[in-house]
Amino acid sequence: MSPTLQRSDLLPGKNLIGTWREARSGRRFDVSDPATDTVFASVPDSGADDARAAVDAAYAAFPVWRAVPAKSRAAILKRWNDLIVAHQEDMGRLISREQGKPLAEGRGEVAYASSYVEWFAEEATRANGDVIPAPVV
């Protein structure tokens, strides 16, 4: 059912909301290749409750992330970028299948996304001037 991937775990078919899980409703929807109308995946049909749970999970994780030194945050983001680059082919295939676009464009989108993660990884250590944390509301 899934596109030919070297790492099938790149398409987990669940939401990452603190942990990998199904939509609260239990509903799913099929993802098909618009070029062939072939179903290649099934994913959670997430709703407002899932969005709220994601916001709550992010809010709960914030104090821990906030305490991580900038150099360590940069290393985490760099590692994420390295993983994106390492799996560019599989991620490009997923984008190509989901959107019905040429594989070269899917690969290009992954490279473009990677450039943003790389930029933020580098910016994490470039805090110039005074850094005043915003209050969490």
Where is each model-derived feature located?
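Glycine-rich loop-to-alpha-helix module at the N-terminal edge of alpha/beta enzyme cores
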Residues: 40-127
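Terminal low-complexity tails and localization/encapsulation signals of metabolic enzymes
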Residues: 1-42, 75, 79, 127-137
